[in-house]
């Protein structure tokens, strides 16, 4: 695989979900064949997001947490502080990748990232995401427009998991969630996990260099 020139990594800090969604949609609509690929890192305030395949009955009792209907694939999930969210904004035609290839690459990136912290995890062929002993630790939801990807992944690092009890995560009743904090004697910081995930992602897709900057 020929090395690609650049992956532009942008850390958005903590940002409302809808603001990130509007920005990634605008970026995807405006990019040209020469636009460098980007990977956005972000942490969202509490929010439930409902994918295009989402069904209302999977929102059990959202309560005071807002619900946003999105254009990504998949069903309902939760985002909140202490969760690593990453949005790969990639030109899949330039990468010569299909959507399934990207899903596999993201899952492998998460598995490799967790392995660096001694956590053994695996993807499921019939249920996108990454799991540890049948507990879900990372969720995926993508959209492709004009051959370019947006939306992405969410990895549970050190967060309050209780809002997941208000939904059927990803449309699965009773699906148990887990996080890195519950699987390690000492939890790394979100920034440390972000840096590890960026390295694994760049290696997996063959980017030669990464630039990292705060927005």
UniProtKB/Swiss-Prot annotation:
Sequence ranges assigned to domain BPL/LPL catalytic in this UniProt record: 33-209
Miscellaneous comment as given in the Swiss-Prot or TrEMBL entry: In the reaction, the free carboxyl group of octanoic acid is attached via an amide linkage to the epsilon-amino group of a specific lysine residue of lipoyl domains of lipoate-dependent enzymes.
Active-site residues, record numbering mapped to chain: 170 (acyl-thioester intermediate)
Catalytic reactions on record: octanoyl-[ACP] + L-lysyl-[protein] = N(6)-octanoyl-L-lysyl-[protein] + holo-[ACP] + H(+)
Cytoplasm listed as a keyword: yes
Source species of the chain: Cellvibrio japonicus (strain Ueda107) (Pseudomonas fluorescens subsp. cellulosa)
Residues annotated to bind substrate: 72-79, 139-141, 152-154
EC number(s) on file: 2.3.1.181
Pfam families in the cross-refs: LplA-B_cat
Gene that encodes it: lipB
Function per UniProt: Catalyzes the transfer of endogenously produced octanoic acid from octanoyl-acyl-carrier-protein onto the lipoyl domains of lipoate-dependent enzymes. Lipoyl-ACP can also act as a substrate although octanoyl-ACP is likely to be the physiological substrate.
Compartment(s) where it occurs, according to its Swiss-Prot or TrEMBL record: Cytoplasm
Entry annotated with the keyword Cytoplasm: yes
GO biological process, one term: protein modification process
Top class in the EC scheme: transferase
First-listed, main subcellular location of the protein, grouped into a coarse class: cytoplasm
Keyword terms: Acyltransferase, Cytoplasm, Transferase
Site (Lowers pKa of active site Cys): 136
Protein name in the entry: Octanoyltransferase
Any GO molecular function: lipoyl(octanoyl) transferase activity
Family per record: Belongs to the LipB family.
Gene Ontology CC annotations of this record: cytoplasm
Pathway the protein contributes to: Protein modification; protein lipoylation via endogenous pathway; protein N(6)-(lipoyl)lysine from octanoyl-[acyl-carrier-protein]: step 1/2
HAMAP family: LipB
């Amino acid at each position: 695989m020929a090395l690609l020139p650049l992956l532009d990594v942008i850390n958005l800090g903590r940002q409302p979900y809808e603001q990130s969604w509007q920005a990634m949609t605008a970026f995807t609509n405006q990019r040209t064949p020469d636009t460098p690929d980007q990977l956005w890192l972000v942490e969202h305030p509490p929010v439930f997001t409902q994918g295009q395949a989402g069904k209302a009955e999977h929102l059990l009792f959202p309560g005071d947490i807002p619900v946003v209907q999105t254009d990504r694939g998949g069903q309902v999930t939760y985002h909140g502080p202490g969760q690593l969210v990453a949005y790969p904004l990639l030109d899949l035609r330039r990468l010569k990748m299909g959507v399934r290839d990207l899903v596999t690459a993201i899952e492998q990136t998460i598995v490799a990232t967790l392995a660096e912290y001694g956590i053994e995890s695996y993807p499921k062929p019939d249920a996108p995401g990454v799991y540890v002993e049948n507990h879900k630790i990372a969720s995926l939801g993508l959209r492709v427009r004009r051959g370019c990807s947006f939306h992405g992944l969410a990895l549970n690092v050190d967060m309050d998991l209780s809002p997941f009890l208000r939904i059927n995560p990803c449309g699965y009743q009773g699906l148990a969630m887990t996080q890195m904090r519950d699987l390690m004697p000492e939890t790394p910081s979100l920034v440390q996990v972000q840096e590890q995930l960026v390295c694994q992602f760049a290696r997996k897709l063959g980017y030669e260099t990464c630039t990292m900057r705060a927005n």
